[in-house]
Each structure stands twice: as structure tokens, then as C-alpha cells.
């Protein structure tokens, strides 16, 4: 049986609970090649200036949208070509979600990190198929799970022969259309040995809160992210966009890219103090 790696390397980016945090960042949905390149380019400029490593993220298919008519993305085939070009152009690793076992091999042939969505985190066949790609696996904790329940989820991947796993906290259901972030979950998740990621933007989501779409409270992203890095995490997950209010999905949660650098600089200061004390 494999134990999870306490240090996970994605290209030249290191995720460890004991070292300065790294970043998973990008728009919620892949909208077009031009938009993906614009976002990746701006993110690279910002992260180069402040000295933090990043993995570029985006979703080719938002398979769990609130309503049938909601925009879902550009699809797997187009997205893989764009991800491949982003890796070459900007020299950054990339991450995207998988929703079925059949998608794992195709996505794993291009993408560096396969992400298991929160709603699917207990789907054994999906976890095993993702594990067998040999890629790094980032598992979102289901909103319906206690943090200690994630140990068995983690073992499904490691016992399939893949120790390259990260666990991601993204909030817990707290009544209807509400999530709450319990920071006690972070040390609990850390105790399983894998790097822990905090998803600061989905944690402020209001699932289905706008009737036919999800709402959110982006004004609390920084509050929760500060708390998470103060506890100590391996990485911060942030979705960003140049115009969140007009984004095709998760706009109410996303950080405007014009505000990204200041936010990251603040988080890096909190992270430094946290890791120095610990």
C-alpha cells in the first residue's frame, strides 16, 4: 500500500504543508483560446513579479451547473489543445476536472493535475481511473463530508498505486444555499499526510442561491484565505477573471484579476509568519 507523498511536485511547482504555499489559479470556465491565453499571461506576469509558483486551472465542462441552459464550456478536445499550448507558451503546469472514468486517460495525456470535483469525491471508479493515469490528483472534499471522511477517499487513490495526491477544502454545507469554512478541517486533513489545498473562492459560493445559478460573496475570499494560510496549507486555489460579473460561471465568487496581486502579497505575508512560527 502506498502512503501519500508529503511533498507533491507538479512540474517545478512544489506543494507541501511545511513550505511556502503555491497557487492554483485561473478562470472557472475555459471560454476560448484567446481568453485562456490572456488570463494565463496576466497570471504569469503577476506571479513572476511577486515570486510564487502557480498551476493554471480551468474547466472544459461545468457538468454540474444549476440549470440545463447554463454555459458549460468548450469541451474536452478543444480544451486539451489549448492546455497543451498554454504549457508551452507560459511554462506552467495545468489542472482541470474530470467527471467520468472515460475522461481520465485523455485528460491525463495532457494535463498535469486531474481534479476530482467535490460532488464526485466518493466515486470509486472515477478515483481509481484518475489514479491509474499516474498524474497528480487533487480531490475536492465534498460539501457533505466531515474532514475525517476524506481519509478513506485518499486511500482509494493511494491503494490504486498513486501516492501523488492533494486534498482540497472548499467549504461545508450549512443550511440551504450556504457553505461555511471550518478551519479545524485543515489540520485534520493534514494529519493524513497529503498536501492540503484551500479553495478560497468556492468556499464563498452560495450553491443555487440565485435560483437558476449559484451566488457567492467574493468580499469574503480574502478573509477565508488569510485564515487558511494562518493555519498552514500547501496551496491556495483561486478563481480569477477580468470581469467576474459577466463571467459565464461562478462570477460571484471569482476575484477580479486586477486585485489578484495585492491579495497574493497579503497571503504570502500571513503564510510566512505561519510557517515561521510552526
From Swiss-Prot:
GO terms for cellular component: cytoplasm. It catalyses: D-arabinose 5-phosphate + phosphoenolpyruvate + H2O = 3-deoxy-alpha-D-manno-2-octulosonate-8-phosphate + phosphate. InterPro entries: Aldolase_TIM, DAHP1/KDSA, KDO8P_synthase. GO terms for biological process: keto-3-deoxy-D-manno-octulosonic acid biosynthetic process. It is found in: Cytoplasm. Its EC number is 2.5.1.55. Pathway: Carbohydrate biosynthesis; 3-deoxy-D-manno-octulosonate biosynthesis; 3-deoxy-D-manno-octulosonate from D-ribulose 5-phosphate: step 2/3; Bacterial outer membrane biogenesis; lipopolysaccharide biosynthesis. Keywords: Cytoplasm, Lipopolysaccharide biosynthesis, Transferase. It holds the Pfam family DAHP_synth_1. It is an enzyme of class 2 (transferase). One of its GO terms (molecular function) is 3-deoxy-8-phosphooctulonate synthase activity. It comes from the Bacteria. Belongs to the KdsA family. This is 2-dehydro-3-deoxyphosphooctonate aldolase. It comes from Bartonella quintana (strain Toulouse) (Rochalimaea quintana).
Amino acid at each position: 500500500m502506498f502512503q501519500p507523498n508529503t511533498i507533491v511536485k507538479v512540474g517545478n511547482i512544489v506543494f507541501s504543508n511545511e513550505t511556502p504555499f503555491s497557487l492554483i489559479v485561473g478562470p472557472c470556465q475555459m471560454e476560448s483560446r484567446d481568453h485562456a491565453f490572456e488570463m494565463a499571461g496576466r497570471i504569469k506576469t503577476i506571479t513572476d513579479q511577486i515570486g510564487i509558483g502557480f498551476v493554471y486551472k480551468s474547466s472544459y465542462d461545468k457538468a454540474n451547473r444549476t440549470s440545463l441552459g447554463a454555459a458549460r464550456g468548450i469541451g474536452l478536445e478543444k480544451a486539451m489543445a489549448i492546455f497543451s499550448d498554454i504549457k508551452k507558451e507560459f511554462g506552467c503546469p495545468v489542472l482541470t476536472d474530470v467527471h467520468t472514468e472515460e475522461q481520465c486517460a485523455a485528460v491525463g495525456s495532457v494535463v498535469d493535475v486531474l481534479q476530482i470535483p467535490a460532488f464526485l469525491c466518493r466515486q470509486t471508479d472515477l478515483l481509481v481511473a484518475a489514479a491509474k493515469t499516474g498524474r497528480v490528483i487533487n480531490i475536492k472534499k465534498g460539501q457533505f463530508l466531515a474532514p475525517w471522511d476524506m481519509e478513506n477517499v485518499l486511500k482509494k487513490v493511494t491503494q490504486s498505486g498513486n501516492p501523488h495526491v492533494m486534498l482540497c477544502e472548499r467549504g461545508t454545507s450549512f443550511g440551504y444555499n450556504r457553505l461555511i469554512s471550518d478551519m479545524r478541517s485543515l489540520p485534520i486533513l493534514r494529519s493524513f499526510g497529503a498536501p492540503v489545498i484551500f479553495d478560497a473562492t468556492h468556499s464563498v459560493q452560495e450553491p443555487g442561491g440565485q435560483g437558476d445559478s449559484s451566488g457567492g460573496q467574493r468580499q469574503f475570499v480574502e478573509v477565508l484565505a488569510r485564515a487558511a494560510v494562518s493555519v498552514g496549507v500547501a496551496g491556495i486555489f483561486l478563481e480569477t477573471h477580468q470581469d467576474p460579473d459577466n463571467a459565464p460561471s461562478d462570477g460571484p465568487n471569482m476575484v477580479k484579476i486586477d486585485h489578484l496581486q495585492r491579495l497574493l502579497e497579503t497571503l504570502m505575508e500571513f503564510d510566512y509568519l505561519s510557517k515561521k512560527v510552526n
